[in-house]
Amino acid sequence: MSATLDRLRRLQELRPQRTRPEPEAPPSPEPLPQPVVTPRGTTRLEELVPGEILENSAGLCYVRTQAYPLASARGQYPLGNLLARHPITFAPFHPNFGLRDTVDFRQAAFIDTETTGLGGGAGVYCFMVGVGTFECGVWSAECGIETNHPNAFPASSDPTHFVVRQFFMRNPAEEGALMFALAELLERYEMSVTFNGRTFDLPLLRTRLQQNQRMYPDLRGSARLLAAERPHLDLLHPARRLWKRRLQSCRLINLEQMILGLQRSEEDVPGHLIPMLYTDYMRTGNAHEMRRVFYHNCEDIVSMVALADHLGRAYAEPAAQSDTPLQGLDWLAMGQCYEKLGQLPSAENAYQQALALLREPAAQADAYQALAQVQKRQGNWPAASETW
């Protein structure tokens, strides 16, 4: 028995032995991306965009204030020239704007928003709301830019500056504070001025205000200026009526270039990129690109002042546009506006002005046809026959 066991042991030793594999080390985790190292202070909002932290009963938000003397030129005319115009000029052409002769541009708030999406809906936030107003007070210059002084006071019959305040929520938790600050400012004014705000900015602000009223009951009944029935001049509509025949686009940036003769700096950012830039800011905390968004928003607001002045001149006294005279297609558009209002003599004059300037055959044909129709409606058959 022992001999048999010895032979079995020797046979076992002759067999190739299996070696137990060493346990594999667990895979090393992929290294986490390292934060971008930049010089101290270059990513902080407070240093890139000087402003102040505003506190109210809903919390904190950030606000940047800039002031422009009324003598500052925006295009060919000083900003203060708009105060010689009256919003009622646009009332006959846009009766649904609710404009009244008792409210002028001194009582207007120029509003522009930057949002987390390009459409509307309850899920879209207004992360920045810029408001421009005519004010008077004490202001100090810093680095060539007028900035708010603590002793400044708003809303006067004799303003000295156009002031832009940009309310910004650094995260969604600050939306309530932003809405409180906005509502407090808007209570002082009687009319809003926007560019495409009738279909975008104001409805979205009303939605966000209603959402926040559930959490902050004190907001209920505030910001009445945003209500649909309050006076509201949306500059996009008179601009389209006047320039849609001549310009391929009536976007604000295009009107700045083609009508006001302005060119923004390289600091500007295309509007369609702004929601993505805010998302990146929320994710990284790097405010470098947000500086460009503040610039874009402020430029939009200040340009509205110059555009309102330009449109006011054109609609009130088109023949007196000596520095920036209307072109042939502009006169054709004005003629159509007057014709819709039943102001046939003014329409006839506008069509005649158009024919004196137009050189393109198709546009001339449109002007001759329109002129003849107006002459016919006035009973001036000999003139209509000659025009035809």
PLM feature spans:
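Short, basic, low-complexity termini and linkers enriched in Ser/Thr/Gly/Pro
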Residues: F134-T160
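N-terminal accessory regions of nucleic-acid-interacting proteins
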Residues: M1-D104
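Metal-dependent phosphoesterase core characteristic of DEDDh/y 3'-5' exonuclease domains
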Residues: G123-E135, P159-R165, M191-S192, G197-E299
